[in-house]
Amino acid sequence: MAKEDSIEMQGTILETLPNTMFRVELENGHVVIAHISGKMRKNYIRILTGDKVTVALTPYDLSKGRIVFRSR
């Protein structure tokens, strides 16, 4: 998936799921399942319930996404 093909949205972590998956509520109210991007995993960035994150969604499946940034 090329970076320019993804849709980036802001969201909040609702709950933690197994295998570093998270349930994220987007600003528009939709709830998606997201996993951590490789660079965040490599740098051991921890994500907890309630964190504000940026999620990259693919136009092909808007129910799944990738967490690319955790706001401070």
Curated annotation (Swiss-Prot):
Subunit structure and binding partners: Component of the 30S ribosomal translation pre-initiation complex which assembles on the 30S ribosome in the order IF-2 and IF-3, IF-1 and N-formylmethionyl-tRNA(fMet); mRNA recruitment can occur at any time during PIC assembly.
Pfam family, any one: eIF-1a
General function of this protein: One of the essential components for the initiation of protein synthesis. Stabilizes the binding of IF-2 and IF-3 on the 30S subunit to which N-formylmethionyl-tRNA(fMet) subsequently binds. Helps modulate mRNA selection, yielding the 30S pre-initiation complex (PIC). Upon addition of the 50S ribosomal subunit IF-1, IF-2 and IF-3 are released leaving the mature 70S translation initiation complex.
GO molecular function: ribosome binding; rRNA binding; translation initiation factor activity
Cited CDD domains: S1_IF1 (cd04451)
Annotated localization: Cytoplasm
InterPro entries, A to Z: NA-bd_OB-fold, RNA-binding_domain_S1_IF1, S1_domain, TIF_IF1
Alphabetized UniProt keyword annotations: Cytoplasm, Initiation factor, Protein biosynthesis, RNA-binding, rRNA-binding
Disulfide bridges in this chain: none
Organism field: Aeromonas hydrophila subsp. hydrophila (strain ATCC 7966 / DSM 30187 / BCRC 13018 / CCUG 14551 / JCM 1027 / KCTC 2358 / NCIMB 9240 / NCTC 8049)
NCBIfam families noted in UniProt: infA
Name of the protein this chain belongs to: Translation initiation factor IF-1
GO cellular component: cytosol
